[in-house]
Amino acid sequence: MTKYKEAHDNYLDLHIWKRKELENYILEPQVLFRLSQQSNDKYEHFLKELEELVDTYEDRVFDQYAEHILKYRKIDVSTANAETRKYMKDMWTNLENKLALVGGKEFLRCLNNWFKQKFSLNLSISQIISEFQKDEFDNEIVEVIRDMIL
């Protein structure tokens, strides 16, 4: 039985987020760049450094994905690893995907440390959210909230 059918049978609305954790939805490079208070000509360099930072999490993402496959499917370790390698090859291709896959809570802690060291700034979740402009929120978040209200 799928999770959606089980939820429907129990009169529940189910939404499975596309990103790993809710915190991943505030990992928007443009917003983070504005919070760094750098001049616009430094944006490309900021993106490069941000991607280098998130790339340090690639092995953790691989391990978590393989562990998830092993937990919920009855396959052997080598098959789970092969599937994970393919998934990572397909998905770990750009900064947007990487920021969706990394553990958001853990990466936010790392990001805050990076901001302290590099920019002498503390970075909080509320600061990040406050920096968002209306059109920068992911459509998925907007649609889920709209569905909950209506």
Describe the function of each predicted region:
Residues M1-L150:
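Acidic, divalent-metal-binding catalytic cores of TOPRIM
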